[in-house]
Amino acid sequence: MEYKTIDLCAGIGGIRRGFEMSGKYSNVLSAEIDPSACETYKHLFGEDPQNDLTTEEFKKLVSKTEYDVLLAGFPCQAFSSAGLKLGFRDTTRGTIFFDLADIISRTNPRAVFLENVENLYSHDKGKTLKTIISTLEGELGYRVIGVSLDENGEYEYTRKSFIRNSRNFGVPQNRPRMYIMAFSKKIYGNGVKSLTDMLPERGNQIIFQDLNAVLEPVVDDVYYMSEGYWETLKKHKARQKKNGNGFGYQIVNAVGIQNPCANTIMATGGSGKERNLIYQPKAGVAGKKLKTKQTVLNSEGIRVMTPLEWGRLQGFIGYGFIDQNGVDTFSFPVGTARAQQYKQFGNSVTIPVIKEMAEFMSACFDKMNSVQMGKIVELVKASDSITIRDIIELLNVSKKRAEELLKWLIESKILILKPKTKTKYQLNSKMHP
């Protein structure tokens, strides 16, 4: 079965692409408000995602759209201090999560997949995440993977429940991120109890062995740091070290480092670049004067990473857009500024991680289908026949879900309509003699 997704807070489509690559999902609607990101998204997917998910117009459009899974890489925002007792419509009002929750409450998708920064776990002393979990589990009727109830009926989870690092999914980037996956109890009923309590912790494919496999062998001189800026960074790091702080630049492929790995690349660019400096001496660079830099280029062979290298770290280049002929088709629209390229990659997701999550979600769907159809067959064996109402009561599922399961069992020729009835079904004697 192919599941339909909607891609909200879409950026340049990293989450969508990861789900598509699993082979089980196709996207039917998107929403993004950043003009430059929209241009890249349109360039990559042939679809203009320029929609504002906070508007009533868009929410009505979603309500009219047949889809199964809501995807969103939403921003981390503080909620009202009014308290959870008021419900998400009061507690989260004015945030993007409020609008996501509103859309979920109106449309009840089969599953929800949310991505956010690692800081979401501890944001506002944990209150932000607590509100999100409480909203999904308590108000919207979803089972969140990695969340359980303690003896007092409080939601229980740890960092390990949600945080996964890109470096464990085939790319050399130390990028811990929050991933929240939830399944509708209204649709799947007690089927959600059959699901595992843990998201995938590692991928099964190495995309780039280490940072050396990501780096371009030769880059344009413009990526080399000016002597003045390089000296400023060294002085800043010395001050930080003197004050007992570990902040400052980092040369991630310095001599002696085995299996080098990049630090997190960021949409803001600055610290993401300075914490990912590259040692790569190049003849003729030292002392060279460029019009774009105030001082000559440094003599130590230090440069920043290129947008192409950032694209590889996120799995966009060298992985996510390779066609059936093995050709890498990723590109930005002509004229996209270098600063925008850094921003869009830094603000996106790591596609190999998302693909692994998508495959895990598919496995969850398959497991619930298998378990629930098995229970239906067991009941038919015990009672001779079964109705839609029996399935609803047995599995605690919606009528739509009961009809879906029954349809699959009939198409598989496991069940047939009982003779002389219109609503009762029995085992197919040819399949179950």
Where are these regions (language model features)?
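Class I SAM-dependent methyltransferase "Motif I" SAM/SAH-binding loop
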Residues: 8-13
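Short beta-strand element of Class I
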Residues: 27-28
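Conserved SAM-binding loop
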Residues: 41
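Conserved SAM-binding strand-loop segment of SAM-dependent methyltransferases
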Residues: 47-53
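Class I S-adenosyl-L-methionine
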Residues: 60-67, 77, 81-272, 284-287
